[in-house]
Swiss-Prot record:
Pfam families, alphabetized: Ribosomal_S4e, RS4NT, S4
Name this protein carries in UniProt: Small ribosomal subunit protein eS4
Biological process according to GO: translation
InterPro entries: Rib_uL2_dom2, Ribosomal_eS4, Ribosomal_eS4_central_region, Ribosomal_eS4_central_sf, Ribosomal_eS4_KOW, Ribosomal_eS4_N, S4_RNA-bd, S4_RNA-bd_sf
HAMAP family named among the record's database cross-references: Ribosomal_eS4 (MF_00485)
UniProt record similarity statement: Belongs to the eukaryotic ribosomal protein eS4 family.
Gene3D superfamilies referenced in this protein's UniProt entry, alphabetically: 2.30.30.30, 2.40.50.740, RNA-binding S4 domain
């Protein structure tokens, strides 16, 4: 389906529910799921306000004026999600999609120096031919690395990825004391030190606690991303 009903779209999408028609554009299959992504056209029209209508938004996108993670995207339904870098080519404005306590996901302006950097959470790894390892990341990206590099990187770790050179610049291990942010659920956008881990048989459902100053919030392991050893290594808040 190309569209879905406004009333059934993810609740955090910044669209009017009772005006503007019955339908709204639906994210196409891609690096992020429907529940945790925004169609590119909605970002152009409703978030950044570069267009007043869907027709105008589609025109801007079809002209190649928008890059996602450094690649021109002309599909107005392209799903944009967690930690993606959005660049408006004619103006030079660059944004990153980050978890936000009020908006669920928000776009924050970033510098051109950070435009080539992206935090990727490791979802798993597999052995491939040649004695190498393939890392699988949260945005659907895969990367083949040597055993020397890959053996130190584990599921739930985070890497700082260079979008331009397509390599890993930094490895941030998942461990107590690391800085993390909640990426989904009721505590989305909350960030702090990883304070506690209560392991369960289903690892992704393990309970973790983040502490910021004296405030402690709990969520499940699958809903957090490590962003730095002591503090975020790149800008992830306004």
């Amino acid at each position: 389906m190309v569209h879905l009903r406004r009333t059934t779209a993810p609740y955090w999408w910044p669209i009017p529910r009772k005006i503007g028609g019955v339908w709204v554009v639906r994210s196409s299959p891609g690096p992020h799921s429907l529940a945790y992504s925004l169609p590119l056209a909605i970002i152009i029209r409703d978030v950044l306000k570069y267009a007043k209508t869907m027709r105008e938004a589609r025109y801007i996108i079809s002209r190649g004026y928008v890059k996602i993670d450094g690649v021109i995207r002309k599909d107005y339904k392209f799903p944009v999600g967690l930690m993606d870098v959005v660049e408006i080519v004619p103006t030079g404005e660059i944004y990153r999609v980050v978890p936000d306590e009020k908006k669920y996901y928000a776009l924050i302006p970033i510098s051109s120096e950070e435009a080539t950097l992206k935090l990727l959470r490791v979802e798993g790894k597999t052995a491939v031919k040649g004695g190498k390892l393939q890392l699988h990341f949260h945005d659907g990206r895969n990367l083949i690395v040597s055993q020397d590099v890959g053996r130190h990187i584990k599921t739930f770790d985070t890497v700082l990825y260079d979008l331009q050179n397509k390599n890993i610049k930094m490895h941030i291990p998942f461990k107590l004391g690391a800085y993390a942010v909640v990426t989904r659920g009721g505590n989305v956008g909350f960030s702090g030190k990883l304070y506690e881990i209560v392991w369960t048989l289903k690892r992704r459902q393990s309970v973790v606690a983040l502490k910021r100053n004296e405030e402690v919030r709990r969520t499940i392991l699958d809903y957090i991303m490590i962003t730095g050893s002591e503090a975020p290594v790149i800008k992830i808040s306004p």
